Amino acid sequence: MVETYHQPAPRSAATGLPVSMKIFMYLLTVFLITQMIGSALFAVYLHRRLDKIEDERNLHEDFVFMKTIQRCNTGERSLSLLNCEEIKSQFEGFVKDIMLNKEEKKKENSFEMQKGDQNPQIAAHVISEASSKTTSVLQWAEKGYYTMSNNLVTLENGKQLTVKRQGLYYIYAQVTFCSNREASSQAPFIASLCLKPPNRFERILLRAANTHSSAKPCGQQSIHLGGIFELQPGASVFVNVTDPSQVSHGTGFTSFGLLKL
C-alpha cells in the first residue's frame, strides 16, 4: 500500500484595503473637514446677523417711541391720555439724564480750570548782565534764552527775583569766573545765594567757594548753587559774590532762576 503525502498550499498574504475603500475614506474625511469649516463660518455669520438684527430692533423701538411722542403732541385720539402721560414722563426722564451728564462734565471742566488758576506755574530764568562788575550783588537781565512765566515773579532793579505767591521753590544759580585774574586778595572766590524776606533782614541760603588758579590763559571755573526753600509773598532772592570783576558774562556762563514746585 503506497501512501501519498500532499503538502498544503501556502496561505496567501493579507492584502490591504481595496482601492475603493481608500477613496471612500478620503472623501469622507474631506467632507467632515469641509462641514466643520462651514459650520464655523455659519456660526460667525449668524452671530453677526443676530447683532445686526438686535441693533435694527433697538433703532425700530426708538423710532416707534419718538413717533408715539409726536402723536401724543398732536393729540391723536388713537392713544389714551394715560399712555401719553407715561411716555412723556419717560422722555422727560431721559432728557434730564442727558442734561445732568452735561452739567457734571461742565462742572468738572470748570473745576480743572479753577485749579489751574489757583496753582499757576511760576518760573524764572535770567542771564547775567556784564555791567555788574563794581557791586557784589550780581545784576541780571531778561535777554537771550530767559524765562519769566507771569507777573507772579518779577526781576526787581535787575538784581533780585521777587515772588508774589507763597510756596516751595527750587532756586538755583550758576556763576562762572576767571580764576587767575589779579584778585584783590588771596581769599577764595565765594558765591552766595541770599534771601530777603518781606520786612526782615537778609540771610544766606547757600554758599560755595572755589580757589584761584595760576593757569594761563584765564582758567574758567563754575560754581553751582541750588536748593528747595519756602518763600513767602514778597520775598526776594539774589546772588552775591566776593569779587564781581572775575565773573564771566559770556553766553551760558552765569545764570540765575527759580521754579515753584
From Swiss-Prot:
Keywords: Cell membrane, Cytokine, Disulfide bond, Glycoprotein, Membrane, Secreted, Signal-anchor, Transmembrane, Transmembrane helix
Annotated THD domain residues: 122-261
Membrane topology per record: Single-pass type II membrane protein
CDD domains: TNF
Topology, Extracellular side: 44-261
GO biological process: B cell proliferation; immune response; inflammatory response; platelet activation; positive regulation of interleukin-10 production; positive regulation of interleukin-4 production; positive regulation of NF-kappaB transcription factor activity; positive regulation of T cell proliferation
GO MF annotations in UniProt: CD40 receptor binding; cytokine activity; protein serine/threonine kinase activator activity; tumor necrosis factor receptor binding
Compartments it resides in: Cell membrane; Cell surface
PTM comment text: The soluble form derives from the membrane form by proteolytic processing.
Site entry: Cleavage: E112, M113
Origin: domain of life: Eukaryota
Principal location class: membrane
Cellular component, GO annotation: cell surface; extracellular space; plasma membrane
Family annotation (PANTHER family): CD40 LIGAND, TUMOR NECROSIS FACTOR FAMILY MEMBER
Family note: Belongs to the tumor necrosis factor family.
Protein name according to UniProt: CD40 ligand
